[in-house]
Amino acid sequence: MTENTSHRIMIVAGEASGDLHGAGLVREALRLDPTLSFFGIGGPRMREAGVETLVDSSEMAVVGIVEVLAHIGVISRAFMTLRQVIVSNPPDLLILIDYPDFNMLLARVARRHGVKVLYYISPQVWAWRTGRVKTIGRLVDRMAVVFPFEVPFYERAGVPVSFVGHPLADRVRPTMGRDEALASFGLDPGRRVVGLFPGSRRGEIAKLFPVILESAQQLRERYPDIQFILPLASSLTDGDIAPLLAASGLDVTVTQDRVYDVMQVCDAIITVSGTVTLEIALMGVPMVIIYKVSPLTYQVGKRLIRVDHIGICNIVAGERVVPELIQDDASADRIAAEIGRYLDDPAYAEKTRAGLAMVKEKLGTGGCSERVAGIVLEMLGKQV
């Protein structure tokens, strides 16, 4: 380094996926310049990476209009906490990770107080509210986007933008071989395994986990020797799922962390929508994506969203590689039937794996966090 002046960086990640990506960025930035200081909103991974979290991201992880309204007090207090810091002691840089509505309000505050803004992982302007690109252009100094098809949206609006690859391309790696992983989870290698991925938000657990368990009950009746495994998100505790699990009567192996080891032992996975579908795609595991929100949220979204798919892995592919069951279609019968098709039809499962390999190719070759860390240092006027 040519400069040793310490810089204070506010970083905001409102969800579990943002916590993961933020942690990778912070680790890489601190490797390049250990004098940097990070604080803001994050979860356990960002804290472990060295971020002082003023607000825990688990308190912010809600989705949908009705769901946000139910948590408006917590979200408002978090905003006021960060706003006060920006006003009273402005950071040298504000890094925003996804979480668009909250983060764009914070970007306005930063702009008024002369704080540079880097937006890492773009709001989904290509999916809905495309007019936000112009607002972003007024409020954000630099975009670091993770999908190549996002670049033209910002270039057309004159927003400085860099395609940095997808951070998951660096991280989605099992820690051991499949046989070893099966043994470590206490699973029988001679019996098939279905993964249950109910999400990282408590709202998702309440809305989606019951139907996931009901579909698992149907699968157990159809395939008596089937095994189930559930990786518990870092934003949740055993208490969030234990009552529903106990009521289901199912024998489910629950583990925390090691999510990629879990994925690789699965023959198929039932999952909520979101970043996790990309992780599963990178592991090449056939999946069924389910999506349920309040009727109001869904009806509003149907009128605003401009893409043909809910699952980000299908959006990246540009076609339906894996089935999506939305709202009333996300019934236990339909979920069990789609998983059963994977288990009963090896050719169909193999075709799905080939489609997921195409998604993996489009996500880039790795090095994302390092590239974003380089942008951070550049915006701070530092050199590596």
Curated annotation (Swiss-Prot):
CC per GO annotation: membrane
Gene3D superfamilies attached to this UniProt entry: Glycogen Phosphorylase B
Keyword flag Transferase: yes
Protein name: Lipid-A-disaccharide synthase
Biological processes annotated in GO: lipid A biosynthetic process
Species: Geobacter sulfurreducens (strain ATCC 51573 / DSM 12127 / PCA)
Alphabetical list of SUPFAM superfamilies matching this protein: UDP-Glycosyltransferase/glycogen phosphorylase
Pathway assigned to this chain's UniProt record: Bacterial outer membrane biogenesis; LPS lipid A biosynthesis
Gene: lpxB
UniProt family annotation: Belongs to the LpxB family.
Disulphide bridges, residue numbers: none
